[in-house]
From Swiss-Prot:
Its EC number is 3.6.5.2. GTP binds at residues 21-28, 38-40, 42, 44-45, 70, 126-127, 129, 156-158. A motif (Effector region) lies at residues 42-50. It comes from the Eukaryota. The gene is Mras. Keywords: Cell membrane, GTP-binding, Hydrolase, Lipoprotein, Membrane, Methylation, Nucleotide-binding, Prenylation. Disulfide bonds: none annotated. This is Ras-related protein M-Ras. Signal transducer in the Ras-MAPK signaling pathway that regulates cell proliferation and survival. Core component of the SHOC2-MRAS-PP1c (SMP) holophosphatase complex that regulates the MAPK pathway activation. The formation of the SMP complex only occurs when MRAS is GTP-bound. MRAS has low intrinsic GTPase activity and may require additional factors for activation. The SMP complex specifically dephosphorylates the inhibitory phosphorylation at 'Ser-259' of RAF1 kinase, 'Ser-365' of BRAF kinase and 'Ser-214' of ARAF kinase, stimulating their kinase activities. Residues 206-208 form a propeptide. Coiled coil: none annotated.
Length: 208
């Protein structure tokens, strides 16, 4: 299906934040979405930022995605990026029961920082390609998502990827469904870093 030309001006920008424990595949999902490659090796991230023009439901937008640190030693940074996010992907690995149990911590922190009873989020069950290592069932994931009243999706960044584009696009759809009054609170000029770029370029990267 043909897509329309990318508009040059006045595109809405959505700040999407990917959170979760270290090693659950946050960077692999993000890199697969932006660069269409699978990175199999785990390299702890401090903070990576990406920009992309994309068309979702016949509407063009700029996705400004922050891939965050999962390591506990960087937990002090979390509130800062949570304040500026328009929506969040809470990622756990289906092979790591502890990462699933820690979802509640991220969910509660987001609501506390945002001072809201609800906020655009999606619960992401990653690494479903590793079925022989699976420790968290689909039903357990769905039950948790129902508890939080947020969507649930299962993903794999490994080629061929499963639901990677859909996950990011669905989060934008959730944000768009919010009532205008709530969205107005988030229209401040905030930045995660310095100069911006367009396209699918990674803007800043600090690797341990």
């Amino acid at each position: 299906m043909a897509t329309s030309a990318v508009p040059s001006d006045n595109l809405p920008t959505y700040k999407l934040v990917v959170v979760g424990d270290g090693g659950v595949g946050k960077s692999a999902l993000t890199i697969q979405f932006f660069q269409k490659i699978f990175v199999p090796d785990y390299d702890p991230t401090i903070e990576d930022s990406y920009l992309k023009h994309t068309e979702i439901d016949n509407q063009w937008a700029i996705l400004d995605v922050l891939d965050t640190a999962g390591q506990e030693e960087f937990s002090a940074m979390r509130e800062q990026y949570m304040r500026t996010g328009d929506g969040f992907l809470i990622v756990y690995s289906v092979t790591d029961k502890a990462s699933f149990e820690h979802v509640d911590r991220f969910h509660q922190l987001i609501l506390r920082v945002k001072d809201r009873e609800s906020f655009p989020m999606i619960l992401v069950a990653n690494k479903v390609d590793l079925m022989h290592l699976r420790k968290v069932t689909r039903d357990q994931g769905k039950e948790m998502a129902t508890k939080y009243n947020i969507p649930y999706i299962e993903t794999s960044a490994k080629d061929p990827p499963l639901n990677v584009d859909k996950t990011f696009h669905d989060l934008v759809r959730v944000i768009r469904q919010q009532v205008p009054e709530k969205n107005q609170k988030k229209k401040k000029k905030t930045k995660w870093r310095g100069d911006r770029a367009t396209g699918t370029h990674k803007l800043q990267c600090v690797i341990l």
